[in-house]
């Protein structure tokens, strides 16, 4: 039971780190788009 909880927590933290990475990537892309639009 405790091991299962640990596995769930590990999975959740891994998912969270992946989501954070994706959000960072999307944020940098949208900033590049904003700059590109602003420069035109």
Swiss-Prot record:
GO annotation (BP), single: pore complex assembly
Primary localization: secreted
UniProt keyword annotations, A-Z: Cytolysis, Ion transport, Membrane, Nematocyst, Secreted, Target cell membrane, Target membrane, Toxin, Transmembrane, Transport
Annotated segments matching region Plays an important role in the hemolytic activity: 3-12
GO molecular function, one term: channel activity
Record localization: Secreted; Nematocyst; Target cell membrane
SUPFAM superfamilies: Cytolysin/lectin
One family name in Pfam for this protein: Anemone_cytotox
GO CC entries: extracellular region; nematocyst; other organism cell membrane; pore complex
Free-text comment on this protein's domains from its UniProt entry: Composed of a long N-terminal alpha-helix and a core region rich in beta-sheet structures. Before the pore formation, the alpha-helix binds the lipid membrane, partitions into the lipid-water interface and stabilizes the monomeric molecule on the membrane. Finally, it traverses the bilayer, thus forming the transmembrane pore.
Family to which this protein belongs: Belongs to the actinoporin family. Sea anemone subfamily.
Protein name per UniProt: Cytolysin EnT
């Amino acid at each position: 039971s405790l091991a299962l909880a640990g596995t769930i927590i590990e999975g959740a933290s891994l998912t969270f780190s992946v989501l954070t990475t994706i959000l960072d990537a999307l944020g940098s892309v949208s900033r590049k788009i904003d700059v590109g639009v602003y420069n035109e």
